[in-house]
Design a protein with these regions (language model features):
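Sec-dependent N-terminal signal peptides of Gram-positive bacterial secreted proteins and lipoproteins
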Residues: 4-26
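Hydrophobic alpha-helical segments, especially transmembrane helices
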Residues: 7-8, 52, 484, 520
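Exposed boundary/loop context
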Residues: 15, 339, 348, 463-465, ...
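Cellulosome-associated attachment modules in secreted, modular CAZymes
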Residues: 19-26, 461-533
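Carbohydrate-active catalytic/glycan-binding domains of CAZyme proteins
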Residues: 27-408, 413-461
Length: 533
């Protein structure tokens, strides 16, 4: 794969503010993912994470067109740092394309619906939200021959939107290229077969991009408009029924900046908040690419907060470049996958022999940014899982920018192969509090090394045996806590080191012997515990 141009724009475009009566500002992030060009995102909350499933734009200057043959999945638990799960589904067999996916969860499985260009919709299934997904039928689930579709001339059978209602009934929405070209059909409980015939939904100036969601008992059908009123927007309708009776309500997402074309969106919740995801073409522009075809056919996904008015209508989103709040800080003292990042320059990712993915294609000057890392009182060392078929290089640990404060440098030597892994360590000084962390890679020419994961370490803390509440003293409160633990009333102690501090005889478990030792200490029968000697 050709190396992506590395220089990123320092400043992303701050975009237009759209004012509508009764609306408030909603904030977006773009781009949120840099390793590949992606579009048509659909969101799913699963296992405490938000997953986005995206079309993957591959540009061929000899064939300027939308080339999308696989699906990229990314996920986050903080809305700033995104894990790259790679291409989780690849078109094959009957399907030559994989366009605009949607994923829903049911039966302890995950079902992906995708367009084979505009000729039909397939379904793939996985046991995990991060894939891999496998084609479930080896043929289209719906196409122009499906009962009730009755495709008029120019009908596009693509852009699926799937939805499982509260009563367990599932629906599939699809279609494109005309106001009367939306179709909805029921799915059976197996999610890979249809039930009955398709019905028509008519959306004013509908073009493509069907999406359905439910809010306060109402059904919201949203879609991309055509060019008849200017630049396409995301408009929506509301109904009391998932298949009929929709009433047009207006625009929820204006034409994004740096787009200049139609759009594709999804609306979903994560941790109680509503979001809308879509795409524009900011990433390719920020890299200084001027080829109009490359700009047209290489998109990037974005995400935005979404709000409702008291009457149930949706407020129009106002798009900004960096508006979302990071939901939690990154813990640097646990193993962090290298493919989880907020931004990068120059690198790629690939499947890793140790599982998951690794960062590869690392050359001199490349970097990875991790947003909002909480170093607390300070890190003293850094570990990195690396592999190199060459002479390696260095990982510079910098704060807040790629040229920011240097807090450590980890030297990486050759390991004999790009998947021959070893752990390298280095000392760290000056990393305290919350910062953006930059892993900056330096060395000679060509590819330097691959990176699987990283982790910081703190200085060892002194254990005060018997101090279970973290007060710095051993007293009756600690005795009471130990009693509660042994009775099963509590499963941990207020002190972060409480479980270790309660093992007073250092036999590897907390039991009645520790209780006796604590009692003797408080009665003055002993002055120290065996574990402290």
């Amino acid at each position: 794969m050709l190396k992506i141009v590395k220089k990123l724009s320092i400043l992303l475009v701050v975009c237009m503010v759209v004012s509508v009566l009764g609306s408030i500002t909603a904030f977006a992030d773009y781009p949120i993912f840099y390793q590949r060009y992606t579009a048509d995102p659909s969101g799913l909350e699963a296992n405490g994470r938000l997953y986005l499933y995206c079309s993957h734009d591959v540009y061929d200057p000899n064939n300027p067109n939308y080339i999308m043959n696989d699906i990229t999945c990314i996920s986050t638990d903080d809305m700033k740092n995104w894990t790259d799960h790679g291409e989780v589904f690849k078109a094959s067999g009957w399907a030559n394309y994989a366009w605009a996916p949607v994923v829903v969860a049911r039966n302890n499985k995950y079902y992906m619906y995708f367009g084979n260009n505009a000729t039909g919709i397939g379904v793939a299934v996985s046991d995990s939200p991060s894939g891999p997904f496998k084609d479930a039928l080896g043929k289209a689930l719906v196409n122009g021959s499906t009962p009730g579709v009755n495709p008029p001339s120019g009908f596009w059978c693509f852009d699926p939107g799937a939805f499982v209602d509260d009563d367990g009934q599932a629906y599939l929405y699809f279609g494109g290229n005309g106001e009367g070209n939306t179709r909805v059909i029921k799915l059976n409980g197996d999610m890979i077969s249809i039930n009955g015939t398709a019905s028509k939904i008519v959306g004013p100036i509908f073009f493509e991009d069907s999406w359905i969601h439910k809010y306060n008992g109402k059904y919201y059908y949203s879609y991309s408009t055509n060019w008849s009123k200017g630049a396409p927007t995301i408009d929506y309708m509301i109904s009391d029924s998932p298949m009929t009776g929709f009433n047009y309500k207006g625009t929820v997402l204006p034409q994004p900046p740096s787009n200049g074309n139609n759009n594709h969106h999804s609306i979903f919740t994560y941790k109680g908040n509503w979001y809308i995801s879509y795409h524009n073409r900011e990433l390719v522009r920020s890299r200084g690419i001027t080829d109009n075809n490359a700009i047209t056919y290489q998109r990037n996904v974005c995400i935005d907060r979404l709000y409702y008015n008291t009457d149930g209508t949706m407020q129009m989103a106002t798009i900004t470049a960096d508006g979302l709040t990071q939901l939690k800080n990154v813990n640097p003292y646990i193993t962090n996958e290298a493919e989880t990042m907020a931004q990068e320059s120059g690198i790629n990712t690939e499947e890793c022999s140790e599982g998951s993915r690794d960062v590869n294609n690392i050359e001199n000057g490349d970097w990875v940014k991790i947003r909002g890392v909480d170093f607390g009182t300070g890190a003293v060392s850094f570990d990195a899982r690396v592999a190199s078929a060459t002479n390696g290089g260095n990982i510079e640990l910098r704060l807040d920018s790629a040229t920011g404060k240097l807090v450590g440098t980890c030297a990486v030597q050759g390991t004999g192969g790009w998947q021959t892994w070893t752990t390298k360590s280095c000392n760290v000084s000056g990393a305290t509090g919350v910062h953006d962390l930059y892993l900056k890679f330096t060395g000679g020419g060509g590819n330097l090394f691959n990176l699987n994961w990283w982790k910081f370490k703190t200085a060892p803390t002194e254990i005060i045996y018997g101090d279970l509440d973290g007060s710095g003293d051993v007293n009756a409160i600690d005795f009471s806590l130990l009693k509660k633990y042994l009775l099963g009333s509590i499963s941990n102690f207020p002190s972060p080191n409480g479980l270790k501090a309660a093992d007073l005889d250092s036999n590897g478990k907390i039991d009645v012997l520790d209780f006796v030792l604590m009692k003797k200490y408080l009665l003055g029968m002993i002055t120290e515990f065996p574990a402290g000697k």
